[in-house]
Design a protein with these regions (language model features):
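Glycine-rich flexible loops
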Residues: 2-223
Length: 223
C-alpha cells in the first residue's frame, strides 16, 4: 500500500474533523445495537468529489470505542492519503458504491439477520421485500407495495473481482438501496451520512422482519 500526503486547507481539515466526529458517533450507535460487533463493519463518507476523497473507518478498529485516529482518508484508488490506520480490503466495495450511485456515505454492518438471510437466499441471488410500511423510509420509495430487491453476492477474498461485480450490478440497477454478501452482512448507503443511517436502520429492520416471518412460518408448518 502506497501513501502520500494530501494537500490540507483549513476548510478540508475542518470538514474531516466534522465527518470523523459524525462517523465515530454513528459507530457507537450501531455498535450498541449489535450491528458492528467485534471490530466488524465499516463506515465511510465523501469529503471531496474532485478529486474523490473518502473518510472511512480503519481496518480492525472497535466501532464502539473509536477516536479520531481510527478514521483515515483514502483516494479513488483506495490509497491512504491521511492517517496511520490501514484500510480494510472492503474499502473497494465502498468505492464501487460511491462511483456507481449518487451515494455520499456507505455503511457496512454485520448483523445476525442479514448474515442468516444471505446464506438462505444465496442460491436465488436475491431476496425481495414487499408490503412493509418501512420500505417508504428508503429514498425514492413512495409506497409499501414497492418490491425492494436486495441482491445477494457470494462472499470472496477477491475484493477487486467482487467490486467489479457490484459495480456492474449497480450500473444496471440504479434503484438499488443495498446488497448483502453471503455469510458476511449488509451494505447500504445514502446521499449523506444521515440518509445512510436511515437506510441501514430501515433495511436491518426489514431483514429481521423477513427472517422472523420465515422462522414462524416454519414453526406453523411443523405444528
Amino acid at each position: 500500500m502506497s501513501y502520500y500526503k494530501r494537500q490540507v486547507t483549513v476548510s478540508t481539515d475542518s470538514e474531516f474533523k466534522r465527518k470523523s466526529g459524525d462517523i465515530i458517533d454513528l459507530g457507537n450507535k450501531l455498535y450498541s445495537r449489535g450491528l458492528l460487533n467485534a471490530t466488524s463493519g465499516n463506515i465511510s463518507s465523501v469529503l471531496n468529489n474532485d478529486p474523490l476523497e473518502l473518510a472511512i473507518t480503519a481496518s480492525g478498529v472497535d466501532k464502539g470505542n473509536m477516536n479520531a485516529e481510527d478514521i483515515i482518508i483514502i483516494d479513488s484508488d483506495g490509497t491512504v492519503t491521511e492517517g496511520n490506520g490501514k484500510p480494510s480490503a472492503e474499502t473497494l466495495l465502498h468505492l464501487a458504491v460511491i462511483k456507481n450511485t449518487e451515494a455520499k456515505s456507505v455503511i457496512h454492518t454485520h448483523s445476525i439477520w442479514s448474515t442468516v438471510l444471505s446464506r438462505i437466499y444465496l442460491p436465488e441471488g436475491f431476496l425481495s421485500l414487499k408490503g412493509y410500511e418501512m420500505l417508504k423510509a428508503l429514498d425514492g420509495n413512495k409506497t409499501h407495495e414497492t418490491n425492494e430487491v436486495i441482491p445477494v453476492f457470494e462472499n470472496t477474498q477477491d475484493m477487486k473481482g467482487l467490486s467489479e461485480i457490484v459495480s456492474k450490478y449497480l450500473k444496471e440497477h440504479p434503484e438499488t438501496h443495498g446488497f448483502v454478501l453471503s455469510g458476511h452482512g449488509l451494505y447500504t448507503w445514502g446521499k449523506s451520512l444521515k440518509e445512510a443511517k436511515r437506510s441501514v436502520e430501515a433495511l436491518e429492520f426489514l431483514l429481521e422482519v423477513k427472517g422472523r416471518e420465515l422462522s414462524l412460518s416454519e414453526i406453523k408448518i411443523q405444528g
